[in-house]
């Protein structure tokens, strides 16, 4: 199942027209663009100058000049390439997005021609500076597409604003979490984005997650079609977050492995950490996959609220599903149509059925076309969606086909939903 621009209103979903040309495309396999029109384009290149007018790539502005000039409904169009942010030892070099777009008229920042604009903050491997985020998004209604943030001195992106969208973005090799939402950030959408190899030297890997909608994050934050792998701590970390987070069609794998030769390494290694600190967070995760994580694939982590867990697959984690902690009175987890393979599942205080460890059929390797987990890191499809491979797809004669329970908002093609993250068509 593809998640192309999921969660986003129709007007924004296909992205935007740019003077009826094809410098941007909703689907990079075609030259077509559709959606809404921008009021103004600011052309930006790595060698751009504040003295240029930014009317074309022949006279590109600098990124900072374009940010200062851009208004709601306007586009900062980035020439693909590397935008190097100078590093000075002991000092931060954050880019702050503190102005705001408007509902229906965000400020767009996007790479041209389906390319990638890489913002390299240049921090050496062992160096970090407190709060030296790469992107610090305090404003509202920004729309980022085709952007990468790497080697930031702390979080790759730290989001406290609201109604922002990150599409087909990547956050990697930063000195803390790839993308974190905190301190009131609400109604942010992260779609078809990757976070990998983030590590915090400050605390020996115990803080750097892939994606972190945590603590004081506000309501309405959603993730779809995202991957988080080989981060020093967790893939997705919803620690101490009472506001509901929705995660769909996302993958978390090989988190918590010491790739940094840190003799004091302290990463946790959960795929999806779905709570913490006894906060009551009624999060929802569907159609997602966890494998090869050091600790747990799907982790309650002392969430005192009931979590909804539907049609997920967990394989060869330390523990596949860890939901053994108590919840507050009146709270209960909801588990349906999940698969656990080559690992244990502990699910207490739950309304649970049609899972492979309870009333559903027991899963085995023969139920799947492939368990080759190297397929998880191949390139995304041209439209930015996760690659459609044989990994964890059900085999023709799998006993997991049509073995699930019908659920609202869970589509299926047979007489009933299949078990696991991927419906066999």
Curated annotation (Swiss-Prot):
Cystines in this chain: 28-114
Binding residue positions for Ca(2+) 1: 209, 233-234, 237
EC number: 4.2.2.2
Known cofactor(s): Ca(2+)
Catalytic reactions on record: Eliminative cleavage of (1->4)-alpha-D-galacturonan to give oligosaccharides with 4-deoxy-alpha-D-galact-4-enuronosyl groups at their non-reducing ends
Signal peptide annotation: 1-25
Sorted UniProt keywords: Calcium, Disulfide bond, Lyase, Metal-binding, Secreted, Signal
Family named by the database record: Belongs to the polysaccharide lyase 9 family.
Protein name per its UniProtKB record: Pectate lyase L
Species this chain originates from: Dickeya chrysanthemi
């Amino acid at each position: 199942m593809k998640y192309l621009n999921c969660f986003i209103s129709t007007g924004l979903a296909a992205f935007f027209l740019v003077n009826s040309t094809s410098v941007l495309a909703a689907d990079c396999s075609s030259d077509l663009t559709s959606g809404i029109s921008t009021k103004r384009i600011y052309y930006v290149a790595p060698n751009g100058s504040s003295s240029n007018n930014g009317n074309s790539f022949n006279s590109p502005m600098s990124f900072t000049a374009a940010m200062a000039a851009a208004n709601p409904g306007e586009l900062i169009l980035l020439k693909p390439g590397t935008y190097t942010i100078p590093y000075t030892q002991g000092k931060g070099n954050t880019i702050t997005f503190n102005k705001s777009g408007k509902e229906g008229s965000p400020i767009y920042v996007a790479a041209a021609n389906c390319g990638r604009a890489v913002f390299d903050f240049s921090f050496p491997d062992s160096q970090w500076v407190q709060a030296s985020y790469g992107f610090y998004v305090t404003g509202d209604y920004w729309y980022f597409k085709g952007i990468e943030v790497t080697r930031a001195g702390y979080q790759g992106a730290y989001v406290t604003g609201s109604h922002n969208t990150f599409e087909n973005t990547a956050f990697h090799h930063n000195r803390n979490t790839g993308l974190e939402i905190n301190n009131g950030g609400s109604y942010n959408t992260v779609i078809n984005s990757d976070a990998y190899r983030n590590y915090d030297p400050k605390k020996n890997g115990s803080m750097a997650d892939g994606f972190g909608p945590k603590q004081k994050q506000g309501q309405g934050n959603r993730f779809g079609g995202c991957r988080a792998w080989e981060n020093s701590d967790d893939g997705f970390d919803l620690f101490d977050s009472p506001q509901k987070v929705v995660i769909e069609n996302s993958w978390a794998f090989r988190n918590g492995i010491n790739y940094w030769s840190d003799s004091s390494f302290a990463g946790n290694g959960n795929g999806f950490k779905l709570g913490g600190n006894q906060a009551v967070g009624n999060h929802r995760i569907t159609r997602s996959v966890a494998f090869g994580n050091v600790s747990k694939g799907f982790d309650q982590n002392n969430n005192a609220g009931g979590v909804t867990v539907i049609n997920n697959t967990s394989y060869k984690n330390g523990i596949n599903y860890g939901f053994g902690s108590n919840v507050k009175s009146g709270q209960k987890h909801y588990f349906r149509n999940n698969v656990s393979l080559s690992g244990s599942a502990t699910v207490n205080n739950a309304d649970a059925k049609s899972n492979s460890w309870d009333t559903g059929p027991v899963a085995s390797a023969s139920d799947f076309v492939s368990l080759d987990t190297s397929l998880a890191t191949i390139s995304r499809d041209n439209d930015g969606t996760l690659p459609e491979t044989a990994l964890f797809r059900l085999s023709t004669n799998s006993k997991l086909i049509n073995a699930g329970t019908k659920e609202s908002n869970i589509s299926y093609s047979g007489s009933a939903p299949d078990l696991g993250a991927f419906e066999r068509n």
